[in-house]
Structures are given as structure tokens and as C-alpha cells.
Amino acid sequence: MSNEVSIKELIEKAKVAQKKLEAYSQEQVDVLVKALGKVVYDNAEMFAKEAVEETEMGVYEDKVAKCHLKSGAIWNHIKDKKTVGIIKEEPERALVYVAKPKGVVAATTPITNPVVTPMCNAMAAIKGRNTIIVAPHPKAKKVSAHTVELMNAELKKLGAPENIIQIVEAPSREAAKELMESADVVIATGGAGRVKAAYSSGRPAYGVGPGNSQVIVDKGYDYNKAAQDIITGRKYDNGIICSSEQSVIAPAEDYDKVIAAFVENGAFYVEDEETVEKFRSTLFKDGKINSKIIGKSVQIIADLAGVKVPEGTKVIVLKGKGAGEKDVLCKEKMCPVLVALKYDTFEEAVEIAMANYMYEGAGHTAGIHSDNDENIRYAGTVLPISRLVVNQPATTAGGSFNNGFNPTTTLGCGSWGRNSISENLTYEHLINVSRIGYFNKEAKVPSYEEIWG
């Protein structure tokens, strides 16, 4: 069967199922959405094992934690939200808001997150009474298919319409392209090629941009805590989280203290240029990331570079030779490796981060470890980012119980990253909202003198 026929059939089935799902009440919808998250929560260990084995990326324990945290955080965030019928009324404006589904959602998912991304997108889609078709990464299709299979098994127990979640069984660029061109709305999480294809599909699309989180350590902050938080984020799942830390920008006068804090907390620091170059040439080939190091452990990366590191090393920190295009290490490194850079003034720290974003990753995420709110707000105002994560691992930009970012696996990067949104994607992006506007007898109509005076 050709991709054309199979995609066409998936779309037709999804449309039929969507019309049935559209008749569901809020209570019925929420029962289904909760079940999807609970399936991943309950099977976290199995899914984590399958993901590591198939993709050969990441860390089993971190993938278990990710399944638990994301499923719980997403359900906790959306469980009380209205998405069916009248969702809000504003008597003072004489407006009534009515939620309606967008239809069939096409969702491409990355090799780096083959379980939680399908779950997240399915929960958001069905919360809005949409159906969804997942286009998995070809090298993660088995675990993604198993995730969809178990979610569907749970939906069947609940008597849900058949085919509200489907998956492309033979994923390819051609199949993904056709799917995106046939759906009502597209979520593109993955490489730049897929995101570009989504925005070229002729359909409303939500894509993501490349990560390259710059992290500023403010002078006088608790360097030990900063090191702990940054290492926690950088080593998580062997560094494949899109918002995880990439560069540490530290005060020059306390640089040695900052590095000492990193070493004390399990980092291996490299400052001699010859050894740094061994890692540089291992991580990047012709200016592009070496696919062989993505999601690999510190030990594997060190072995590839021909460098011995102490057993138990959590991350590798390399001394950079300059910001932006001066050093390819200032690009995104999807493994537990950081580049360290010095600054004299806080304004210079922000300039260094800016140079690195102009090199790669504009619009995504930054981190700052500081007690100075003026500096925090300055960085948040000046940098071309959608999220500034304060005094916590940058990996929490995707939402956690300790911050206000909406929990998601799709992080919009705004126009900087050539995306349509500069926030975390949620169910709200997958509903249409109609507005009923009554004649407002109580409205005060200002005179032109009042307006222009």
C-alpha cells in the first residue's frame, strides 16, 4: 500500500472519529485525557527501556522520571480547564467565549522524545476534542507505536471512538509531508527540516526552533548551587533535552571559583587548547554536530575524543575561545558537554549570550543564576528568547511544579526561531474560540474629546 493511500485512509478515519468525539461533554473528554497520561505514568519503566534500546540515546532512569513528571504535570495543568462549549463569559464586555475543535492534528515527533511527545500531543489534542495522527521518527517508530497502542487500548476500555489516535506505521519524509498537508493543524517537534515542512504545508502549524540555552552565573550568587542546578540540567537524559544548558557564562574575577564549584559537583574541566580541540573535533564535523555523540554518555564521548576522564564524571566543561562564530562549541551540543566563557560586566555577559544566539538557538531558552532582580529583568528584556529560567535547571523550561511555564514537550521560539508562537504549546493552541458579542447597553461611549484629549 502506498503512502498516499495509507495517509489518505488515516485522515478519513480521523475525520470520522473526530465528529464522534466532538459530541463528547467536558467530563467525558477529561476521562479520556487523564487515561492517556496515566498509561505513560504506569508504564514508565517499560517505555524508558524500549526508548533507550531503540534509539541508543539518553539515560533509562531519566526517561522514567520524564514519563512520570510530564504525564503528571500535564494532567495537573489541564484537568480543570474548560474546552467544551462555553468556556468563559465577560459580562462587562458583553462577550461569551465558545470552544470548538480544530479537527485532525498531524504531529511529528522526534527521536529524542519518542514516548512523552506523542503522549503530550495526544492529551492536548483530545482535550480540545480533536483527533491526532502521530508521525514518529523512523528510528523510534517501535516505541512510539507501542505508546500509541497502549493509549488506544485504554481508550477502548473507556468506549472512546475508534481511531482518535493513530500512527504512521511506515514513517518517512514523504509520508510526514503528505500527512501535514492533509491535516487541519500541524504540530512539528523535531529537526529543522520537519519544522520547515510544517510551515510550508499550507496548514496552520506550530513548530519549534533549535535549542542553545545560554546560562549566566551572576557575580556573588551561590556558585555551588548554580553548579548543581546547571549540572542537573546538562546531564539529564545525556543532554538531549532541547532547553538544557549549553554555555556557562561566568564572572571573570570569580571564574576559578565557579569552575571549582563545577568540579566539586562532578564536572571534568578542560582548559588546555589541545585537549579542548580533541573534544571540539569530536563533537562537530564541518561545523555540524556529530550524530554519533547525540545522547551519549560522558564516557563514550571522552573515549571518542581519546581523553581519559574520572569514573563518575557527570558533565564535561570546556574552556571556550570566544563567543558566537569564534568557537563552534558555542552551538547546541546534544550531549553532557558545556562550554565556559568569561565576562567582566553583566552587560558583557548578556552580549556574549546574544552572540551565541545569533550563531544558533535564537528564540528558545536562557538561564540565569542570580539574586539581582534588576539583572534578571535586564537579561529577560534584552535577550531574543521565549523563556528565561531563573535559579533552576534550564530543562524546567518545559514546565515543572516549581515554575509557571506551561508543561509541554513543544517549546515555541517565536519569530526569532521562525516559529508561530513564543510560548509553550498546550491544548489552548488546539481549539478554535468563537466569540458571541451582545449589544452592551451599559457601555460608556467616550466623546472624541475624551479619547484624544
Curated annotation (Swiss-Prot):
EC id: 1.2.1.76
Active site: 242
Keyword vocabulary terms for this entry: NADP, Oxidoreductase
Reported pH dependence: Optimum pH is 7.0 for the reduction reaction and 8.5 for the oxidation reaction.
Coiled coil: none
Binding site for NADP(+): 188-193
Entry GO MF terms: oxidoreductase activity, acting on the aldehyde or oxo group of donors, NAD or NADP as acceptor
CDD domains named in the record: ALDH_F20_ACDH
EC class: oxidoreductase
Domain of life: Bacteria
Catalytic activity: succinate semialdehyde + NADP(+) + CoA = succinyl-CoA + NADPH + H(+)
Function per UniProt: Catalyzes the reduction of succinate semialdehyde to succinyl-CoA. The enzyme is specific for succinate semialdehyde and succinyl-CoA, and only shows low activity with palmitoyl-CoA. There is no activity with NAD(+) as cosubstrate.
Quaternary structure note: Homodimer.
Name assigned to this protein: Succinate-semialdehyde dehydrogenase (acetylating)
